[in-house]
């Protein structure tokens, strides 16, 4: 192609280079100023911000709950300390009772010593009596000797008279001594009687006071035991609630840790993707650099073509001038020839001149020919063989590169879609986990409220007098499933891009969550029923042996009805629950006052087991039991084992109580036998025996379970009160009359001078060998001695009976002390268990705090990672901005080149001919095609920039659908004009990245592409451009994918 019409291009190109350099410097200074002015912020999405705020609020709530648990633990410790102080007070009271018992034993020992002294005195008196009898015998022998030897001597008679007088004197003295001894004995007897009366009164008062104190102590012990049992039950319920909350928290922590591990894995994948993106960005940068180099080479080729065209034009002008000169000379020669013919010499000279001119022109042609051959515009088509081959190879390479880049861009778009879907799933899972946490907290609050209501109902029931009787100690142990399948909501990262499948999965996950929540609520209601059944039963288990009391039946019916109402409110949808409800209603309708509660409880257990089996069969695919959840079930199995151990303990206690009751019954039967064997005139034995027989009937009823221990104790108290009123005493196997002696008997003992004597006693006295020579005095002496011995024996027997009574009382007190010690041991064991539970709660709270700290540290690490990723993204954005700036500079240079070309066109229109006008039109077409290709290159580069931008985090707010549609319509309109109007070349604004829409909503072109560079072009030039480039307005979107290949394939035409 001939380029002779551009002789002025060289100076204009020099000027354009200077203008481009100045514009580039100005643009760099403006960009640096804008970069200095614009603050750099870290972009965080709204969902991430809300997620971080939610985590902070959860941590604060967990801190508040931990503080509440600390306060509860402190209250438990204070209660334990108060219990220990009460136990110490009980031990001090027991020590005081032991001291009193020791005092009573000392008093008994003193009384025994007094009895021994009296026995010694009686033994001395007996010895004196024996000596006196020996003397009487000797005197009788002497009298016989005197009667036999009366005839021997009168002197002996006088001597005997003297001896008789001395004997009478000794008798008088002995009688005086006996009188003195009788007075002393009377005084001793009076003192003994007074002591007996005082001791009897004191013992009676002491026994009454002790019985009253013991009754008070027993009542206080029972009340305190009931209070302690209630407090222990409350503490057990609180510990169960705490253990459940801790288990739920541990499950939540495990889930959070799993989610964090998954998030870490996702972050690692994102990091790897970012690294890949960085590599791709580097490769794209390299490709852009290569393209820029090629553009520079093409620009240099353009300049060379322009220079060659200018030189060709100059040579052409010179040739024209020479031709003109030759024509002038030819005309001159013709005129000379016409005037006159030249001679031979003139012809030879003309030949030489013509040959010289031909040589000069041939040399000039030979000089011009290599330039024309080397130029790409020599042939009429405008292409040379080497240039065409080079352009085709480059076009094929660029097409392949474009296809590879498009494939990579599509892969990157798919990966970003996958990541967005995964992030959306994560957000939904986090929302679901938060909802589950809220539901669990609400359930815990409702459980606490229900426990408080149950405690208030229990206190109100205990106030009622009809409900003070015993209840059966039955405990319903229901194995809770505990399968909190909130973790099943979290699916795998592999997602389907279609939205319908995603919606279906979300609906299935919601259905699973609802089903699992209903199942968990059902199990919680069962546990509440178990608690309600255990609380009143355990509070009254110490006062009952078997489980067939009427009031116990009423209480159990009330508890089961409350549980039934709770179950009716818990779940109303599943068929298993409806079946369970019908079965439970049948069982409750079949309950009667005479029914066995243990049987009812067994039926309820069977129903619960069937319901658990049905729930497991109905949802085998939805409820997945993981090993971690199985390990979470272990505390509930321990609770069941503890319930079984408690039942065994209660059974052993019931057996011990049965043995004690049978011993008491045997004692009362022995008392009845003694009363029947030794009935006295002062006792109405028949009524007392009938009372004992009624007591034995109640004993049989208690053993059979028809009556409770309260009736047994009341009947036993009636028997003892009757025995105390009738003054019945138990002395082993022999009854005494010490306490029922009449005043006549006391007078008989007190007055030995009375002459009313029974025949049996007189015969016993005469059997001792008394001779009735002088019947008056010896008979009276024997009678007095018999009465004294009988009275002493009776006193000894009375003292022995009193001693035995004291021993029995002491044994009873010892038994009571043993019972109190057993109660104290039980209380201590209960305190130890409470302390252990408190220690477990402390350890669990410490574990919770440590886990919270680890979570905080992990959250800090994640924040650090996020900040690092944000920094990387900012770096990538800065690099993209630099590339945009470079692109804008290239666009400005292209605009300047176009302006120069337009100027050359305007100047060349005046001087060119028709052929040159055709050439110019061709050149203008080629330039317009180049401009179109440049626009397509700009579009592809801008699309690449957008795709690089999409690797940044999502914006905080999405644009509304109206704005999206408007932007999309504007982009379509602008897309039709970018190929024709050079002012539509994209100048990307950094402010557009804030309100960026997702890639799947973007159009191939951005509204920011409509920004123009009107500062460098005038309206007339724009109009001329629009008029000339009207043929290119019908560009299709396929040019965006094949723009680079067309541009580089058409460059060879220059």
Curated annotation (Swiss-Prot):
Residues 371-380, 450-461, 470-494, 1007-1032 have a biased composition (Low complexity). Residues 359-390, 448-506, 951-1054 are annotated as: Disordered. It comes from the Eukaryota. Keywords: Coiled coil. Residues 64-139, 174-200, 250-341, 389-463, 637-666, 788-944 form a coiled coil. Belongs to the FPP family. Interacts with WPP/MAF proteins. This is Filament-like plant protein 6. It comes from Arabidopsis thaliana (Mouse-ear cress).
